[in-house]
Structure formats: C-alpha cells, structure tokens
Amino acid sequence: LLKNDRQLLPLSIGKLKSIAVIGPNADQIQFGDYTWTRDSRFGVTPLQGIRKWAGTNVKVNYAKGCSLVSMDESGIRQAVEAAEQSDVCVLFCGSASAALARDYKSSTCGEGFDLNDLTLTGAQPALIKAVQATGKPVILVLITGKPFAIPWEKKNIPAILVQWYAGEQSGNSIADILFGKVSPSGRLTFSFPESTGHLPVFYNHLRSDRGFYKSPGSYDSPGRDYVFSAPVPLWSFGHGLTYTTFEYSNLQTDRTSYLLNDTVHVRIDLKNTGKREGKEVVQ
C-alpha cells in the first residue's frame, strides 16, 4: 500500500451500492516470470475476486478501458461511463509478461524485455486521468513486475496499491485487501523514481562539494541536482502502509559498539495501537 489518503481503504462493502472495476489488468491473471507450469485457464482475476465479494448486493460495473500497449483510447468513454455510475472506482493497470499471462501476446516486462521509459505504457495514463476527472474516489492497483514513474498519479489518485504478479489467486487476494479482510503489510524492495531520468534512485546520495540539494529548482533559479526536481524517489525502499498503526518502544541492542563484521542483535516491544489486525515488517 503506497498511498491511502483520508483512509479511503479499506472499502466498506456494506456501504457500497456500486463499484467500477476498470483497466487492462482488471480481468487478467498475471502469473509472473518462470511460472509456465500453471494452466492459464485456471485462476481468479481481480474482477472475479471483487464480484465474489460484491455478491448480489453491490453492482459491479466493468470496463477494460484500454490495452497495455496500444494508444487506442476508444474504450475510455465506456470506462468513464462505468465510473460515473459507481460509488468508487478501482483501476487495474501495470505491465505484462505475455507468455505467462492469460491472454496477452505482448510483453512489457520480464526477462528479455526492456523499455526506454518508465511511464505506464499505451493509453493507460489517459485512462487514469479520464476516470479521475469524474470526481469519483479512485483506487489505482498496479499489477506489475517493475516500478513505474507515476508522479501525476501520486499527486492526484487518493489510494495506490502495488500487487506485483500475485499468481492464480491474485483476484481473491487483492479483493481481501480492498475490502479489509487482510491488512497490507508489504514493504518496497526498491524505490520508485520520479522519472526515467532519475535513475539510479536511492536514498544515500554522497555529499558533493556543494552540499545536499533536495528541493526542485525553477526556470528563474535552477536546482543543482536535477534542475527542475529533487533527487528523491516517489516512494523509497522500505515504504509500505497498512490499515492500522504500530508503536515501537524499549529498543535494546546487545552491545554499545560493533566491529565491521559483527552481527547486531536488536530487541523492541511492538504494539498494535490501531483498531484492526495487522502485521508489521520491523525496520
């Protein structure tokens, strides 16, 4: 869980009358690289998982909107209509490892497939902006095997999740998270860059002779790292939110100083101070 403004997530199934499920990965199963032993006919898509939760009480309005690679925007109108008819919208975008997905014939991620840009491919950015423009609450779920440079989405979309390639039960697992049966607890194992030009992106930049410059510049006063942006990631290594809160206390180490190859043993007291069950990756 990368972002969750105003606690939009988890969704309360009892308060919803309708939900829009939109995007090129909404009715798709992404098995991920080196999983060709799975039969692509099996598995649960996000759309199927959400419909299972919705039952007969919540209307599910589905629209693909666009494909992962084509610039064709003709399906966006249908996606906007689905959003306008719904209480909340869940967008499933991202990438594909084609041979290991259900239907796709083109890869945008995986071994042997490199892109020269880290923005979302095809008409996906246009789809996201069109759905956001309806004014309905929007949740963006990235089903992908890599990070994306999505500064506009970070600024304008209230809730963002990354599911990666979750396998044949991906639809059930993401529905459980969206509706609060399970609290997300994952942490990023790499950073999300601001743009393709921000690579490499990491937190521990070496200090230069000019010091640290973490603020974006302007046309009148250019910055000294990246001229018009700061050299910090959208989300850093280790970032990850959940639906509850935790309190760290009584930090103890087994000694006061360490040599280079020593093992550091640390003990803490960890308390769930929120109202939901949850897991915490201590860091």
Task: Label the predicted regions.
Residues 1-283:
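C-terminal non-catalytic regions of proteins with extracellular/luminal or membrane-system context
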